[in-house]
Amino acid sequence: MKDKVFEKPIEKKFEFDQAVASVFDDMLSRSVPFYDEVRHLVISLILAEQREGMKVLDLGASTAKFLLDLHSKMEAGMQLKGIDNSPAMLERAEQKCQAFGASIDLALADMMEYSYEEEDIIVANYTLQFIRPMQRIELVKRLYESLNEGGMFIFSEKVVFEDKRLDKEMIDIYYDYKKTQGYSEYEIAQKREALENVLIPFTIEENIRMCRDAGFRNISTIFQWANFVTFVAKK
């Protein structure tokens, strides 16, 4: 279904409700530059590490698109889990997993309150940016503690730049990109207003520092397009 959420005047801040869940896959593919390519990149990285019984947790699993893609490509019997705090998203995720016959453990949970078990890989695709900065830092510390030695935390984020002129230029370039994906200036402005104080991005340096302060020692960026970046932090 095509994303038309912001064609009408907004009445509330952005949230992952039924209206968003129904068009979320389209929203991601048209709103996040190279979303499909990054998803495939992260899956390839996980598959390079795959082994029987390896545990993979997706934070903010939404409609389970990432986990289903990973499930369809894996050869070893990995244990796939996903959590999301949106009932509407989880409902769609469960429907899709059932339709594809995929054995994926899904849970309705808040990332800040979830009881993390030992994991080998944790993935967060454009998820941390919706968590308040101080809570975000505490969450990453908990993720580090839950990872087994040698484990990986792979996350993608929208970022800001300390250079204000460069930051504005990157935002303008991104909005031009959205226009090429069929979004009108009105829709772009509506979504920008809805996300105000909901999506709070860090700089690249702040994301790296957050991981380092949590205990990660090997932190790399493996993809960047303008103000969209994918990081890998190893324990």
Curated annotation (Swiss-Prot):
GO terms for molecular function: carboxyl- or carbamoyltransferase activity; S-adenosyl-L-methionine binding. Coiled coil: none annotated. It comes from the Bacteria. One of its GO terms (biological process) is tRNA wobble uridine modification. It holds the Pfam family Methyltransf_25. Its EC number is 2.1.3.-. S-adenosyl-L-methionine binds at Y35, G60, A61, S62, D84, N85, N125, R192. This is Carboxy-S-adenosyl-L-methionine synthase. The gene is cmoA.
